[in-house]
């Protein structure tokens, strides 16, 4: 496999989103307090996206298990990163957003770029494989 970096990328992405999701699922109030940000009026507004991060983390581990075969899932991961980055950067530029959200936006932007590179690398690898479908 030429794209040896893809498997570790998705393992890291799985741990990153999984740990972040579990943190916001288990101790959301403490995280908001640490950043001195008022939490939403109901924890479900935080826990639902936290659980989505855990689901995506599982998907990233599945991609890591067989990146070429599960290449189509990379697009869903890229979609997740766009869904977070777009509003975060939009509000950071146009109005205001608590600074606690911006380090994760920059991380997700980095993951988005790497996911795009992985998508193309896996496509080339699949095309070169004699067993490709």
Predicted segments — roles?
Residues 3-9, 13-44:
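Membrane-helix boundary elements
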Residues 33-43, 72-73, 97-107:
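Non-cytosolic membrane-interface motifs at loop->transmembrane helix junctions
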Residues 15-23, 41-64, 76-86:
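Core segments of alpha-helical transmembrane spans in multipass integral membrane proteins
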Residues 58-72, 92-93:
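Juxtamembrane helix-break-helix junctions at the cytosolic face
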Residues 65, 86-103:
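Membrane-helix boundary connector in multi-pass membrane proteins
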Residues 110-133:
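Membrane-water interface at the C-terminal end of transmembrane alpha helices
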Residues 1-5, 129-132:
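Short, Lys/Arg-rich, polar N-terminal cytosolic tail immediately upstream
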Residues 74-88, 104-115:
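Hydrophobic alpha-helical segments of small multi-pass membrane proteins
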């Amino acid at each position: 496999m030429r794209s040896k970096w893809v498997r570790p990328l998705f393992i890291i992405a799985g741990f990153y989103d999984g740990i972040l999701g579990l943190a916001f699922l288990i101790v959301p109030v403490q995280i908001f307090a640490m950043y001195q940000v008022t939490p939403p009026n109901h924890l479900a507004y935080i826990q639902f996206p936290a659980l989505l991060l855990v689901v995506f983390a599982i998907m990233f581990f599945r991609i890591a298990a067989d990146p070429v075969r599960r290449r189509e899932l990379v697009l869903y991961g890229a979609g997740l990163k766009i869904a977070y980055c777009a509003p975060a950067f939009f509000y950071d530029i146009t109005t205001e957003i608590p600074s606690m959200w911006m380090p994760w936006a920059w991380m997700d932007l980095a993951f988005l770029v790497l996911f795009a590179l992985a998508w193309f690398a896996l496509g080339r690898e699949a095309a070169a494989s004699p067993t490709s479908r």
